Amino acid sequence: LRDGDRSRYLGKGVTKAVGAVNGPIASRIQGMTIGSQLEFDELLLNLDGTPNKSTMGANALLGCSMAFCRAAAQSRKLPLYRWIAEIYQPAVIGILPVPLMNIFNGGAHALNGLDFQEFMVVPAGAPSFREALRMGAEIFHHLKVVLSGEHLATTVGDEGGFAPNLDDYENKHEQAFEFIVQAVESAGYKLGKDIFLA
């Protein structure tokens, strides 16, 4: 939910969303005992009452949901990732967290004509978060080399991934994936083993 007031942050301000948090959301949840993350999220969705979260704003609802989740983790003296794993997938606690790294942008956050919003790499084959982060960063830098080699722009989109214009390619969406595959291989990793795409 954005304010739409062009005199503040060119219309991208979020005082309406903040007002929803401090107003109707706060009024509804103050003093409540809420048993689970699912119950809290359902309460927020019902309070908004729209399929696309347009009343309160996805930014307000997500912020509240995340705050509830963090508070629940802190009350149990657990790291956030471990708490989320216990809620949703207790069997995979040993391999979390695995970052999803946005390395190629399209959609509304890039002016390159790609329909997909984000092309991500998932270094799920890494033995630790530290190694996963390193793998993702190396792939990102290799992707810059791949794009430069094709004489494509290496500026980044709003979400931090590269956002070159691929209109000269017959199938620009497949080409975006092909560039990512080249970067993964150039970095020395194997798709489907070390790295997955999302």
Task: List the model feature ranges, each with a label.
Residues 55, 63, 102, 120, ...:
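Structured core elements
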Residues 35-40, 58, 80-83, 144-161, ...:
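Flexible, glycine/charged-enriched surface loops at secondary-structure junctions
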Residues 158-173:
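Conserved short loop/turn motifs at secondary-structure junctions
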Residues 38-53, 63, 89-100, 140-151, ...:
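Short, hydrophobic/aliphatic alpha-helical segments
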Residues 23, 62, 66, 70, ...:
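Residues on a specific face of well-ordered alpha-helices
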Residues 89, 94-157:
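Mobile "lid/hinge" segments at catalytic clefts and subdomain interfaces of large enzymes
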Residues 1-78, 87, 133:
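Metal- or metallocofactor-binding catalytic centers and their adjacent structured scaffolds
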Residues 64, 171-188, 194:
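Active-site pocket-lining segments that scaffold enzyme catalytic pockets across diverse folds
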